[in-house]
Design a protein with these regions (language model features):
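Alpha-helical transmembrane bundles and membrane-interface segments of multipass inner-membrane proteins
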Residues: 1-174
Length: 174
């Protein structure tokens, strides 16, 4: 590899990783702001029902769907931090070669998990406020995690893209 190509590769890696970090930070801020705003807005009772989704304040001591609510908070926090560290390491390594939607997906997963960890570290619970009536109440960071995971799965299922031009074959003899 030439020195010029190597510099281009390093720049591409830097840009991809910067995109990951910036999008993650922005989504964390949005998720935290939504949780902070939900508490005073919904403390007096349920908010508007928009049909498919409504607003109801729930403080979740557990993890997904309230599971693990009886586990010690410190244990949930340590396991969550370990998972975030693993995903962040995977993202840092793979993002330079990943398509944009996988980068966005990894940022969503990291942001959602980090936001919920920050929220839990404040008072031992996660603030949930989105309610469907047929699904446990959840929050915007949960949406980031779900959509992000779906984007990552799409990237895994996507056929690999070759960097070489397609091979042309001669027409068959008739």
């Amino acid at each position: 590899m030439t020195r010029h190509a190597s510099a281009r590769t390093r720049k591409r890696e830097w840009v991809a990783r910067t995109q990951l970090v910036v999008l993650t930070v922005v989504l964390v801020e949005v998720g935290l702001a939504a949780s902070v705003l939900a508490v005073p807005w919904l403390s007096a009772g349920p908010g508007p029902d928009l049909g498919v989704i409504g607003f109801r304040l729930v403080f979740n001591p557990g993890v997904a769907f309230g599971l693990g609510g009886t586990l010690p908070g410190w244990l949930i926090a340590v396991v969550t931090a370990a998972v975030i560290t693993g995903i962040a390491t995977y993202a840092w390594i793979t993002v330079p070669g990943s398509p944009w939607f996988v980068r966005a997906g990894l940022a969503g997963v990291l942001a959602g998990a980090s936001t919920n960890l920050i929220d839990r570290s404040i008072d031992g619970v996660v603030t949930d406020y989105l309610h469907t009536g047929w699904f446990p109440t959840f929050n915007l960071p949960d949406v980031f995690i779900t959509v992000g995971a779906a984007l990552v799965v799409l990237g895994v299922l996507r056929p690999p893209q070759s960097t070489f031009p397609p091979v042309r074959t001669a027409p068959e003899d008739r």
